[in-house]
Amino acid sequence: FNMKKIVKRIAAMGAAVMMMSSMAIGASAANSYNLHYTKGAPSSDNVCEKWMYGIKAQNNGYLKSTCKSINTSGKFSVLANGYRSSSHTINCGSFDIWNKGTTNWKNSNYKKGYSYDVVAEFGVSGGYTNISKYVSSASASGSFN
């Protein structure tokens, strides 16, 4: 009776279970984002953008998103830019999700039933790169559908 073999087998089973659960979580969270920024924190701790692929438009003219955001200082918005998933070079325009909550932002380029790649990102005055000038702490979470 070999103890090492049993330990290895248990470890392999544990890894397989962990992989399966993380895959399931990944699939359900494919269209959701959780962004956060804290001034002074290491950049690896700040999540300023997330790409989501193949989000199917449910309506003509806009993609719908739910967004909740917390902003402790300064002006803040989450920007979302959509691109046709068939070609990343065709820009489908952009819309803003403000920290007051969201509505359906109009954009005539979106077509119902087509899939789009979307990026949700922190943005201040037109770009998420200068967020540190205006905001000391902010977070946003939501999903596209």
Regions found by a protein language model. Give the residues of each.
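Solvent-exposed serine/threonine-rich low-complexity stretches and specific carbohydrate-binding patches
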Residues: 38, 88-102
